[in-house]
Design a protein with these regions (language model features):
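Short, well-formed alpha-helical segments that are part of the catalytic scaffolds
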Residues: 10-28
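Acidic helix N-cap motif at the loop->helix transition within catalytic regions
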Residues: 17-20, 41-50, 94
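A conserved acidic beta->alpha catalytic loop
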Residues: 25, 35-48, 59, 86-87
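The conserved acidic donor/metal-binding loop of glycosyltransferases
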Residues: 80-91
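Active-site nucleotide-sugar/metal-binding loop of Leloir-type enzymes
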Residues: 69-81
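Cell-envelope/extracellular polymer assembly enzymes that use nucleotide-activated donors
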Residues: 5-7, 31
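Catalytic-site signature of metal-activated, phosphate-bearing donor transferases
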Residues: 65-72, 91-214
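Structural signature of alpha-solenoid helical repeat junctions
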Residues: 191, 228-230
Length: 249
């Protein structure tokens, strides 16, 4: 199709409602490869019908990094560029051409705008740079939840503002698996400020006010916790927890 061989890869479970929209968005790739981890709603059949290569496999015990690494392993070794997305995400059209314009020999990763949420009137809400486009070899996923890509060697990256990935989640989707995985993630890497922040936020969602406050105060005290947006969020969550405890000002 183009200068480089591009493969999209993903994991999924019970996401039939997103399957057709996602496949339409990912169709600019040469290959679409999916690891289905136990769907009961026909998701694999829809994806296969629309041209995806689907493998079904249970991942036990569940960890997102294990599932992502297994899905990445399904990508043929002769692909040049791997694009990891979730089924509740869509690229704006033209992403493949934008990627090929920016990619060149020696590049190992692409960063691109990720529209995580939208305002009530449909405008971009929270936007940050995502980094889940990478060369086929020399990469792996790490972390039981909120997993991140890690490279085996120093990486040359390119920034591609013309690629726009949008997040359109199911608001009814259960968060039940996240808390134990976040607790595991922090136990494995106690100094990972990002996961400490996420754990404190999760305690807020569960109404565990004291755990929320203690965890986020620890986050704010960590020397590595320098991202202003995340620090501000921790402060807001602490204030909310105190308010829920009846101790707000």
């Amino acid at each position: 199709m183009g200068t480089y061989r591009v493969a999209v890869y993903a994991i999924c479970k019970n996401e039939a409602q997103f399957a057709r929209r996602w496949m339409a968005s990912m169709s600019e790739a040469d290959r679409v490869i999916v690891l289905d981890t136990g769907s009961e709603d026909g998701t694999p059949d829809i994806l296969h019908e629309l041209g995806a290569d689907v493998t079904r496999e249970q991942v036990e015990p569940w960890r997102f990094d294990t599932a992502r690494n297994r899905s990445l392993a399904l990508v043929p070794g002769n692909m040049d560029i791997c694009v990891c997305t979730d089924l509740d995400e869509v690229f704006r059209p033209g992403w493949r051409a934008a990627l090929e314009r920016a990619w060149c020999p020696g590049v190992g990763q692409a960063h691109y705008p990720y529209i995580w949420s939208f305002t009530a009137d449909g405008k971009d809400g929270v936007v940050f740079w995502a980094d889940k486009i990478h060369a086929r070899h020399g990469w792996h996923w790490a972390g039981p939840v909120h997993e991140i890509l890690r490279s085996d060697a120093p990486v040359r990256a390119v920034f591609v503002p013309d690629i726009r990935l949008e997040h359109h989640p199911d608001p009814a989707k259960s968060r039940g698996q996240y808390l134990p995985l976040l607790e595991l993630a922090v136990a494995e890497e106690p100094e990972n400020d990002r996961n400490v922040h996420y754990l404190g936020r999760e305690y807020l969602f569960y109404g565990r006010w004291d755990d929320c406050i203690a965890t986020l105060q620890r986050h704010l005290a960590m020397p590595s916790a320098t991202w202003r947006d995340e620090r501000a969020a921790s402060m807001r969550y602490i204030a909310k927890a105190y308010q829920e405890k009846g101790e707000g000002g």
